[in-house]
Amino acid sequence: MDAAGGVSSVRSITAIFLVAYGLLQLPLNALAEATPSQIKSIRAVRTDDVPVLDGRLDEALWNQAITVVDFHEVSPNEYEKPSEETRFYVVYGKDALYIGAQFTDSEPEGIVAKVMRQGDFSEGEDGLKVILDPFNNGRSGYVFQLTPNGIRGDGLFRNVTDINWDWEAIWDAATTIHDTGWTAEIAIPFKTLSFSPENDTWGINFTRTIGRRKEDIGWESYNRSQNPANSGRLTGLTGIEQGLGLDIVAGARVSDTKEFNSPQADVSDTQFEPSLDLFYKPTPSLTAALT
C-alpha cells in the first residue's frame, strides 16, 4: 500500500470512530436526562396555621408556602410554553396537606365551569388535578380534581393507567372566579391517605386545564401523560400521622313520594334513611370501608 492509501485508510477509520462515538452518546445523554437527579423536587414547608377555605389565597399561611411556577404545556404541544401563568402553593400542618392554586386568565369570561353538582364533571371544563404518591413507588397513589365552580372529584390509582373513580375521599376545597382568572384552596387530611410515617418523600404532580383551548398545563409529564410514574417529588414531610386509622362519616337521605291518582292524593310518604360510613386503615397501605 502506498503512503496516500495509508493516509486515506486512517482518515476513514477515524471518521467511522467519530460517528460511532457520537451515536453512542445519544442514548447516554437521553439516560442522563431521565435520571432521578433530574426529577423536579420541592421541599415541604410546615405551618401551625390552619387556613379558612374560601378560595381567596389571602391568608398569611400562603406566603409561607413553597411556590411552584415551572410549568409546561402537556397537551396539545408537550413542553411548549403555556398560554397562561400558572402557580401552585404547597404547605402542610400536623393534620393535613394544603394546596393553593392561582390561575391567571387573560379572558376570564371564557372560563368554562358548567357543572354545579358534586361528583359530576363535563368534558371541556376548566379545572385542576393534584396527584399524590405517598409511598413514592411510581405505581400507586391518589388523584384529586377540582373545577372553578368548586366541584370535587377523587380517584385511586390501581396502577399508572387505571384509576378507580368510585373511591371516595374525605377532603375539602373552595374556589373563587375573579376578573384575572380563578383561585383555589385545598385541604387533604393525612387521615384520608395511606402512607408510611417514616417516609418523608412523596410523589406529587399538578395539572391545570384550560377548557376552551383544550390545553393541559403540567409540572411533570411524559408522552402527554401524567401519573405516579412521571411525577415530581415532595420532600421533608416529617411529624405527620394517620391518627387511629378510623374515620366515621354520618349522612342521611330524605325522600318524599306522593300518589296523584289515588283517593289519598293529598297524602305524601316521607322517608328518612340515615347512613354511616366507616373507613379503617389496618395498615398504612390498606383501607377498608363499611357502609
Which role does the model predict for each range below?
Residues I13-P27:
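Bacterial N-terminal signal peptides
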Residues A30-T291:
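Structural preference for beta-rich elements and adjacent junctions enriched in aromatics
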Residues R11-T14, A101:
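In a subset of proteins, long, contiguous C-terminal domains/tails are tracked
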Residues M1-S12:
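N-terminal secretory signal peptides that target proteins for export/translocation
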